[in-house]
Amino acid sequence: MTAATLTTPDHLPRRMAVVVFLAFALAYFFSALVRAITATLSPTLLTEFSLNAQDLGLLAGGYFLGFSLTQLPLGRWLDRHGPKKVVLAFLSFAVLGCLAFSWADSFHGLLAARVLCGMGVSACLMAPLTGYRRWFDASTQLRTNSWMLMTGSLGMLAATLPVQWLM
């Protein structure tokens, strides 16, 4: 193999690129929604679990604790296993975290679930960016990265009034 062969990305056909983008964008939307939903759920959490502001802050921080615990090994896992496998594996932890959060009957259960959610969604931005670097040309990467960030913003918006309507 020549050096040129090693550095040439495997560009995806257009249809497959759209499917890959939509799958990754949905995961990042979910990540942003889970990150921001604690604020929307706070009135319910305050009453049902008798929490105070400090507890709510710790719940919000639990997400970031879980998120940060995986960041150093995440790069190695992305390089070794690829973005598709890594994001699927991580999202399974996010689903478990969301289920655990819904079944929690104590503050400690909520906190453990938030940490698990944070760990689970921690690959939802870096995995797509890694995949886009591998599979898209440079001009397409700029657009897809921008659209990904917009999708995350929509996830944060979805965690507000739409979630309140569902409650």
Model-derived segments and spans:
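Extracytoplasmic
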Residues: 19-51
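Residue-level signature of mid-helix packing/kink "hotspots" within the transmembrane helices
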Residues: 36, 64-72, 156-157
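Extracellular/periplasmic helix-loop-helix junction of adjacent transmembrane segments
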Residues: 41-68
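Conserved MFS/SLC helix-loop-helix module at the cytosolic interface between two early adjacent transmembrane helices
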Residues: 69-105
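Cytoplasmic helix-loop-helix junction between adjacent transmembrane helices
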Residues: 113-151
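Helix-loop-helix hairpin linking two adjacent transmembrane segments in secondary transporters
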Residues: 148-167
